[in-house]
Amino acid sequence: MFKPHSLPPPELFIACSSLVRPATTPFYAKLDQTLNSFDFADQARSLCAPAYSETGRGRPGIDPVVYFKMLMVGFFEDIASERGIAERCSDSISIRAFLGYDLTGTTPDHSTLSIIRQRLGQEIYEQVFLLILSALDKHGLLKGKHVGIDTSVIQANAALKSLLNRNTEEAYWEYVRRLASENGIDPKNTEAVREFDRKRPKKMSNEEWVNPYDPDAKIGVTKAGATDMIYKPEHTVDLDTGAILQAEVRLGDEADQKDLSLHVLQAQVNINQAQNTAADNLTIESTAADKGYHAVAEMKQLQAEGIRTVISDPVKNRKRENLDIEDARVVRKAKRSACSKSGKALLRRRGMHLERSFAPILDAGGARRTTLRGLVNLNKRFKVSAAIYNLSQLMRKLFGVGTPKQLAAMGKALFLLWRAIVMVGRDLWRMRGTNPAERQSSLYDKIWLRLAREVANGTTGTLGWISHSFKKSLTSTGC
């Protein structure tokens, strides 16, 4: 028989030994250790100090280090909203310890996160990004020789049905009802009007329509192919290490190639500041991008700076006689670079590293559908997300794991490897006394079949480096 459990009445005094201890969370302990390795707390406080009053009047503000740590929790826990981040930090004992709060302390509310976000200017977020980028450079994770650039899509916190006409201020549904009435449909019949709206060809433009709740959001196409209000995040990534060199959110109706040279040169500025080198130092040798970035004027600017443009031409069999001599030379150099063996290798690395950077931030980091409004707010959050992604790369360098899921997968992988070794050892014992050549051939077959089965049943890809070292050890022992 069980005993019903309910919340006991509150007590006036509680012994310290009776308090709940934080659960051991190796990931956040390693994250804190990584932050301490480059003195993140003191440097972040000095960067944020100008945004706070020095008079000492009133209630002291929340430590900005706590604010950035809470954003890290949101990134690693896949929580997009500030309300959700605040609730998670308040509920978890281990995260409270990571933030520096005990059981009796009150963690910051979601409204506090909003106030701090608005208080800190964009330049502070940029400096925090450079602070972590500098830490990557000290561990050899910043080369800055070959870079790749690409954009993705963020769904805005705004609805298409809330659009207003810029000229007449007519609401979207009023506009649809008027069109339905002109086509002989009763405007009071909601189902008929919705059916009419679903079947009619959409001809909405950003020049004609605006969302009153988020004027910066633009009408565009999402990753799923649907029409929605969107923004465009952009990354410039180091193709040798995968580190994000420059990140920003752009308006959803901007062309990809707009200001390409400016964004690449901004990445170079970030590299110079992170490496503490001269402002005119140029380390970038090549830029890889897809066809959407093919713009003659932008490529001409990059080539004039001595940067190789590995960008495919979207126009097949382009007639260069329609271009002037200088533009034709720029297009020819870009095409030659994209078709070369080294250029194709850079394009493959570009696809790998850029997808690897977008997926943790947008899909696993909860930023694919934003809860914020306004280009400035999105840029602040996205800059921090890019910095945290770089921080996870540094953790992978130091500890072999960069996210809580990777830490959990590593533990499972080690268990599966141990089980595979035990089974292989059992097979070795059974095969004693046989021909050594037959034993080695049969043993290898059993080993890799066993490991392949374990990987298929468990963590695909996690055992790759473990199985490789295991094979080398078996070869060296002559089994």
Regions found by a protein language model. Give the residues of each.
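Hydrophobic alpha-helical scaffolding
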Residues: 17, 21, 118, 122, ...
